């Protein structure tokens, strides 16, 4: 352990990083294989170019809370495991695997081959109903902030579902939508 001034941490980590006066240098967490994830029961969350580390962290926290076994993000166009992501995840980064995939559509195809029902979440989809998936292993696929699911990702999913919204908003932040969808899927 080394003690240093707060200003030095600001300089080392960047002024926009909330470090609360502490920093740790650690090895990366091990990444399990997709096969080992498939051996565990529970939903899987797939992120299609979700780029804000705070959204990814919040999604991981919700995924851990509602029994997901892993979150899969693309190896590019997705944030690294930074302090901001870890802070938003509130411990989920240490308990829930974050896998990296080269190609999201191919990952969905591999999951479908393993009898995982892949549901893309989109504002224009039919209403999501957790009880309708009671007898299926499910992967919830979430699109990027603003753009949503990419065309190939959407076409590769088994179905596209949405959240029933009665208010004045047309859509939700991806992390809020993920939490609601994961809750709905957990009501089995």
Predicted segments with their positions:
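Post-transcriptional modification and biogenesis factors for structured RNAs
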Residues: 1-188
């Amino acid at each position: 352990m080394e003690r240093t001034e707060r200003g030095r941490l600001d300089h080392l980590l960047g002024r926009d990083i909330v470090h609360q006066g502490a920093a740790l240098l650690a090895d990366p967490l091990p990444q399990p294989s997709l096969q080992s994830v498939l051996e565990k029961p529970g939903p899987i969350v797939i992120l299609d170019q979700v780029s804000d580390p705070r959204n990814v962290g919040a999604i991981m926290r919700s995924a851990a809370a509602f029994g997901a076994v892993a979150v899969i993000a693309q190896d590019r166009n997705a944030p690294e495991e930074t302090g901001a992501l870890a802070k938003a995840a509130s411990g989920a980064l240490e308990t829930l695997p974050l896998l990296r995939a080269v190609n999201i559509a191919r990952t969905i195809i591999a999951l479908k081959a393993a009898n995982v029902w892949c549901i893309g979440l989109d504002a224009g989809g039919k209403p999501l109903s957790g009880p309708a998936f009671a007898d299926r292993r499910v992967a919830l696929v979430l699109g990027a902030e603003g753009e949503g699911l990419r065309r190939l990702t959407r076409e590769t999913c088994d179905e596209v579902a949405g959240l029933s919204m009665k208010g004045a908003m047309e859509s939700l932040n991806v992390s809020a939508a993920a939490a609601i969808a994961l809750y709905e899927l957990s009501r089995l």
